[in-house]
Amino acid sequence: IGMVVECKDGYLVGNDGCKYSCFTRPGTYCANECSRVKGKDGYCYAWMACYCYSMPNWVKTWDRATNRCGRGK
């Protein structure tokens, strides 16, 4: 019996709709944050935002089409 697990890659977003900033964070910050949401791994992309791999589909990720960062709630 096989099991299909849906997962995705992407930028983590906070409640404000903005990407998780990692500019002034320690090197392990993004990997830890990605792990916290059950992602496989993560890194600080260009020292600006956390990018995660193999996260469950329920995790909110940044999308240009639905970006609401800086636009209020």
From Swiss-Prot:
Question: What is an example of a GO molecular function annotated in this UniProt entry?
Answer: sodium channel inhibitor activity
The organism's superkingdom is given as Eukaryota
- The UniProt entry lists the main location of this chain as secreted
Name of a matching Pfam family? Toxin_3
Which tissues express it? Expressed by the venom gland.
Q: Arginine amide occurs at which residues?
A: 71
One GO cellular component assignment for this chain's record is:
extracellular region
Q: Which InterPro entries match?
A: LCN-type_CS_alpha_beta_dom, Scorpion_toxin-like, Scorpion_toxin-like_sf, Scorpion_toxinL, Scorpion_toxinL/defensin
Q: Which UniProt keywords apply?
A: Amidation, Disulfide bond, Ion channel impairing toxin, Neurotoxin, Secreted, Signal, Toxin, Voltage-gated sodium channel impairing toxin
Q: What processes in GO biological process is this protein linked to? A: defense response
Matching Gene3D superfamilies: Knottin, scorpion toxin-like
Q: Which cysteines are joined by disulfide bonds?
A: 18-69, 22-44, 30-50, 34-52
Instruction: Tell where it localizes.
Output: Secreted
Q: Specify the LCN-type CS-alpha/beta domain's residue ranges.
A: 8-70
Function, as annotated:
Beta toxins bind voltage-independently at site-4 of sodium channels (Nav) and shift the voltage of activation toward more negative potentials thereby affecting sodium channel activation and promoting spontaneous and repetitive firing.
Q: What is known of its domains?
A: Has the structural arrangement of an alpha-helix connected to antiparallel beta-sheets by disulfide bonds (CS-alpha/beta).
Other comments on record: Negative results: does not affect the cardiac Nav1.5/SCN5A, the peripheral nerve channel Nav1.7/SCN9A, and the voltage-dependent potassium channel Kv1.5/KCNA5.
The record's family statement is: Belongs to the long (4 C-C) scorpion toxin superfamily. Sodium channel inhibitor family. Beta subfamily.
Protein name in UniProt: Toxin Td4
Organism of origin is: Tityus discrepans
Taxonomically, what lineage is the organism?
Answer: Eukaryota, Metazoa, Ecdysozoa, Arthropoda, Chelicerata
